[in-house]
């Protein structure tokens, strides 16, 4: 499964995942340290994407080294999320050397190679003024395309990503002052008459290491997530539900008609 172990342990028996689709979630976190001053009726949202990109090795592929892959957590718009996320802990399959990988700066990702698909746990730890409890995410590493009848190709990787929106209710004043106007975060309309705290002094962005993924080497393969995408999928799902309801109503009407016919015949 790995390039650092000769173990022949089979990959965990996991169900196949679907083609890359928008899985829209909204995860509401618990409040941060109660000692900090809270801003009531305000929520800060951080849209994130997590998943993997996998490349088949072609002629270089072997029985235990068929793919190179990367698993990651990134901002949904490829902005730097380290303003909120302090570190990410990736838990790989036990057959890897050092299966627990701690990434303390962006990009929050792990690159490896191997042959098997398995579930990867990702634990996000936040800065102390954000939230004192971590968030656990789970991703099934996908190496092979859904269409198994077609030939494998080195030109296009397998990409599987999921979207989540982490919501922090009643943020601390220091948190809001530190991150306001940051492009990786979204803020709802503030209550009437509410004044934002003064922005916190930050270091020179020109000297700070760039933490976004806009120029990432895998960026061309990243999926695009937006509210428009979500609305389109919700509309499509609603149409499917309505069509299913209409079909059930027709079936019920047909059954009721048959029952009425049988009842009329028995009364003769």
UniProtKB/Swiss-Prot annotation:
UniProt keyword list: Activator, Chromatin regulator, Coiled coil, Cytoplasm, Developmental protein, Differentiation, DNA damage, DNA repair, Flowering, Nucleus, Transcription, Transcription regulation
Localization: Cytoplasm; Nucleus
Tissues with expression: Expressed in roots, leaves, inflorescence and flowering tissues.
UniProt xrefs under Gene3D superfamilies: YEATS domain
Described function: Negative regulator of flowering controlling the H4K5 acetylation levels in the FLC and FT chromatin. Positively regulates FLC expression. Component of the transcription factor IID (TFIID) complex that is essential for mediating regulation of RNA polymerase transcription. Component of the SWR1 complex which mediates the ATP-dependent exchange of histone H2A for the H2A variant HZT1 leading to transcriptional regulation of selected genes by chromatin remodeling.
Any single GO BP term: regulation of photoperiodism, flowering
Protein origin, superkingdom: Eukaryota
Biased composition (Polar residues): 1-20
Cellular component GO terms, alphabetical: cytoplasm; NuA4 histone acetyltransferase complex; nucleus; Swr1 complex
Keyword Ion transport: no
Entry protein name: Transcription initiation factor TFIID subunit 14b
Family note: Belongs to the YAF9 family.
Organism the protein comes from: Arabidopsis thaliana
Quaternary state and interactors: Component of the TFIID complex. TFIID is composed of TATA binding protein (TBP) and a number of TBP-associated factors (TAFs) whose MWs range from 14-217 kDa. Interacts with TAF1, TAF4B and TAF12B. Component of the SWR1 chromatin-remodeling complex. Interacts with FLX, a component of the transcription activator complex FRI-C. Interacts with SWC4, and with EAF1A and EAF1B (via HSA domain).
Disruption phenotype: No visible phenotype, due to the redundancy with TAF14. Modest early flowering. Taf14 and taf14b double mutants show a pleiotropic phenotype that includes small size and abnormal leaf morphology. Taf14 and taf14b double mutants show a reduced H4K5 acetylation in the promoter region of major flowering regulator genes including FLC, CO and SOC1, and a more pronounced early flowering.
InterPro entries reported in the protein's UniProt record: YEAST_sf (IPR038704), YEATS (IPR005033), YEATS_dom (IPR055129)
Coiled coil: 229-263
Region (Disordered): 1-36
Positions of the YEATS domain: 38-182
């Amino acid at each position: 499964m790995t390039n650092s172990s000769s173990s022949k342990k089979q990959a965990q028996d996991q169900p196949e995942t679907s083609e890359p689709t928008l899985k829209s979630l909204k995860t509401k976190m618990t409040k941060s340290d109660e000692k900090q001053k809270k801003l009531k009726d305000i929520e800060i949202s951080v849209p994130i994407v997590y998943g993997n990109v996998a490349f088949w090795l072609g002629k270089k592929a072997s029985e235990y080294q068929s793919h190179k892959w990367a698993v990651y957590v990134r901002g949904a718009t490829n902005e730097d999320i380290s303003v909120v996320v302090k570190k990410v802990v990736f838990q790989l399959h036990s057959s890897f050397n050092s299966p627990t990988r701690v990434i303390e700066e962006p990009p929050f990702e792990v690159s490896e190679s191997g042959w098997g698909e398995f579930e990867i746990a990702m634990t996000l730890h936040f800065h102390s003024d954000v939230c004192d409890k971590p968030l656990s995410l789970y991703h099934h590493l996908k190496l092979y395309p859904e269409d198994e009848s077609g030939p494998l190709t080195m030109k296009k990787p397998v990409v599987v990503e999921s979207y989540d929106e982490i919501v922090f209710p009643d943020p601390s004043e220091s948190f809001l002052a530190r991150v306001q106007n940051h492009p990786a975060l979204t803020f709802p309309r503030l209550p009437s008459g509410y004044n934002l705290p003064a922005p916190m002094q930050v270091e020179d962005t020109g000297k700070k290491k760039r933490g976004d993924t806009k120029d990432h080497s895998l960026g061309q393969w990243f999926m695009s997530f937006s509210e428009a995408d979500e609305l389109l999928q919700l509309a499509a799902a609603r149409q499917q539900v309505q069509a299913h309801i209409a079909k059930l109503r027709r079936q019920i009407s047909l059954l009721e008609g048959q029952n009425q016919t049988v009842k009329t015949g028995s009364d003769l």
